[in-house]
A protein has these predicted regions:
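Non-catalytic RNA-recognition surface used by pseudouridine synthases
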Residues: 1-71, 77-221
Length: 221
């Protein structure tokens, strides 16, 4: 378990309850945050439903939806922790994106374009998104090229941005500005708000932990 301070202005009466590290697993599942390392394939809703059934809890919601093809950090809130939705889910996100272009794009051309897109941009949700399709402004705090292969027309980028930024839309706009097609072929989220990859577990790790708890009364997993 990792301790993170989400609200440093909050206080509690020490006469009631106990520190999080001393709470039983039942209390943690009634008011905890789970970070799942989402695999490629299932939807965020499917993953949450599986986790809810596996853990045997009624209230488990997720936020920061990832498309089925995307991987990485998916936030799940247990029980009373759903009250923290606004605090937990409004933080910046960081992604690693793999793009494939319709023509050869030089590093200089791509880096030059990336430089013009840092800061505030207009970002329209895709038609298939779950939110209302309308123009919205978002901020790209970090946007840089990690690696590229000009011959195969592939580029790997890292992006740190506001919550609610649609990377698929950003990829489309990059293609338009370069006068070519640009396909988002892979997307991985490795940071969301105060959480990073070190805070996450896979569904297999969760399955193993639940088995140890139920069959061997071992909650250390």
């Amino acid at each position: 378990m990792t301790m993170l301070t989400l609200d440093d202005t909050a206080s509690s009466d020490p006469k009631h309850g106990c520190p999080p590290e001393d709470r039983p697993i039942e209390a943690l599942l009634d008011a905890g945050v789970l970070m799942i390392d989402k695999p490629r394939g299932p939807t965020s809703h499917q993953l949450t439903a599986w986790a809810r059934e596996m853990l045997g809890i009624q209230r488990l919601g997720h936020g920061g939806t990832l498309d089925p093809f995307a991987t990485g950090l998916l936030t799940m809130l247990c029980g009373k922790a759903t009250r923290l939705t606004d605090i937990v889910l409004t933080g910046d996100k960081r992604y690693i994106a793999i793009l494939k272009f319709g023509r050869e794009v030089s590093d200089g051309e791509l880096i030059g374009l990336i430089g013009t897109l840092k800061g505030e941009i207009y970002n329209v949700p895709p038609l298939e998104s779950a939110v209302k399709v309308q123009v919205r402004s978002r901020v790209l705090h970090e946007f840089r090229l990690i690696e590229s292969d000009t011959e195969s027309r592939i580029a790997i980028l890292t992006i740190r941005c506001n919550a609610g930024t649609y990377i698929r839309t950003l990829a489309r706009d990059i293609g338009l500005l370069l006068d070519t097609t640009c396909e988002l072929v892979e997307l991985h989220r490795d940071n969301t708000g105060p959480f990073d990859q070190s805070h996450a577990c896979t569904m297999q790790q969760m399955t193993d932990a639940v088995f140890l708890l139920r069959e061997h009364d071992d909650d250390r997993a």
